[in-house]
Amino acid sequence: MNAISNRREFLRTAALAGAGLTLSSPLLGTKPKTVLVFTKSSGWEHDVVKRIGGKPCIVDDAVNDLGNKLGFNVGVTKDGRIFESKEFHSYVGVVFFTTGDLTTLGTDGKPPMTVKGKQTLLDAVRGGMGFAGVHAASDTFHTQPDPPDRSNRYIAHGENEDPYLRMVGAEFITHGRDEDPRLQTANVIVNDPKFPGLGGVTSPVSFMEEWYSLKDFAPDMHVILTLDTHTMNGACYQRAPYPVTWARTHGKGRVFYTAMGDRPENWKNEFFLNLLGGGIRWTIGDASAQLEENLKQAAPGYAEIPPKQAPEK
C-alpha cells in the first residue's frame, strides 16, 4: 500500500476510534504487519494523546508516519474493549501510551479494559505479540495498593509487582517538579548503539524531557539507554544512573520500552523517532538485535530508590 492510501485508511480508523474500535488496514498485493496504538488515559491525560476536534492525537499521527516509512500498518483506539474482541488478535504488536488503572473509566472517559481483557493482553504478549511501551506505559497498573501518598511506589516489590509492570520491565515512581524544573536537559548514555534505529548515534545524547524516575527493573532486561543523573536537579534524581530505554523478551513476546515521549516537540525529534521506530520494528520481528542481559553492567546502581516525596497538589 502506498503512503497516500495508507494515510487515508489511518484517518478512517482514527475517526472510528473516537466512538469504538478500529479496523486494521487492508493491503494491496501483500499483507504487512499491523500494530495497535492504545492511548487510553485512566490517570493523567498527556497532551500528546489528546484528540482535539476529532483529529488524531500526536502519538497516533507519529506512529502512523513511522509505519508509512518503515512498512507496517497502524490501527488506533482508546477503547479498552478491544482486548476482548476478535480484532485484537489480528495485530502482531501493540504500542501503549497509557496511564492509571485501565480497568477503570478514568480521566478520558473511554471504555475501560476488563480484568479479563488485561489478562488477554498479557497472555498475547507472552504468546508472541510484540509490545512497545512509551513514557507513561510505566505509569499504568501500579502495584496495589497505590494510596494517595504514593508511598507504595517507593518500595521494591520484586516478584510481587503487578504482572503488567513485570512485563514492561519497571514501574514509574515520580518525575521532577516545576521548581526542579520538571523539564530538564540531561545526557543519556547509549549502551547499545547497534540496536535498531540507533545506527551512527554517538554517546552521550543530550535530550530535554520530563524524565521519569523508575524502579523494579526486570533483571533480564537489555539496557539500551541509561540516564546520567549526575547533573540533574530534584530529589527524584538523587540516585545513581538508571535505565530509561530497554528491550527484553517476555515468554515468546518481545517488549520494548522508552521513558521518553512526554513533550509534543519530541514527537518530531529524529533521535526519538528513530529509536521508537526501531523498537516497534524489533517487537514485531521486522528487525533483529542481540539482547544480552546487561542491567548490572549498564547501571550498577539501578536498585537505588530516591527519597520519598509528597505528591504534588
Positions of PLM-derived features:
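N-terminal export signals
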Residues: 2, 9-29
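A glycine-rich, often tryptophan-bearing local segment used as a flexible ligand/cofactor-contacting loop or short
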Residues: 101-196
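Helical hinge/lid and interdomain linker segments adjacent to catalytic or ligand-binding clefts
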Residues: 5, 37, 45-133, 137-141
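Extracellular ligand-binding/catalytic regions of CAZymes and related secreted enzymes
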Residues: 39, 59, 69, 78, ...
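Short, solvent-exposed loop/turn segments at secondary-structure junctions
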Residues: 42-43, 82, 100-102, 138-140, ...
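C-terminal segment of N-terminal export signals and the immediately downstream linker at the start
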Residues: 3, 25-44
